[in-house]
Amino acid sequence: MLKQTAGKRLPFHICGEANGLEEEREQITELGSAFTKGKNGSVYTLTIIGQIEGHQLAPETVKTTKYEHVMPLLAQIEESDEVDGLLLLLNTVGGDIEAGLAIAELIAGMKKPTVSLVLGGGHSIGVPLAVSAKKSLIVPTASMTIHPVRMSGTIVGAPATFQYFNRIQNQIVEFVAANSGIGKQKFLHYMMATGEMATDVGTVIYGKEAVSCGLIDRLGGLSDALETLHRMISARNRREKKKSVEIS
């Protein structure tokens, strides 16, 4: 849980603090996040891993990303003068659709430079999270699973239930198509494929295919993601400087 801080100080402020290293380690342990300040700008790194936990608590044995932690943190990052850009490191197995889409919508709505890097996996609701950043990268060995909306537990076997599923699914398709280079029909083709997975409907795509189909912007690793983010930060700073000169 995020700590309450005095004034406008953010929980990730580490510069000039006597206990800065201890606070930084605590942020990495509790939130899987880190704040770094260098000559190319200040970057906040946030990991989104495991299962996206929504309104229902996941079992203690499952690694999760809690939406009630991430959402206020994203708002603070957007508002803070200390942070120039956001780097998202993704390795997800899916999770709560509403919670995942809520996080993805927040990221997509940020004005600050954002870059996502898919590592290991970006499965299910991890796909909208991956494309929510302004630039997305994927390592060659990472995989992304695209499948229809599913619900665990008992459901009512009525037409209205399947209509509800279809409406949620359309929201995901619309979001992914709007925030990436893949078309709706192509994404639906991957989602509804029946010959790709032995026990499920859908498709598993890897790094190169994710880029070639337009889902992810480019192949790359950590240094590539940081380089992309630094370029975006520099471009934004130049635009703001030019705007301030014109106003004055």
Describe each region flagged by the PLM.
Residues 1-127, 132-147, 151-248:
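N-terminal organellar transit peptides
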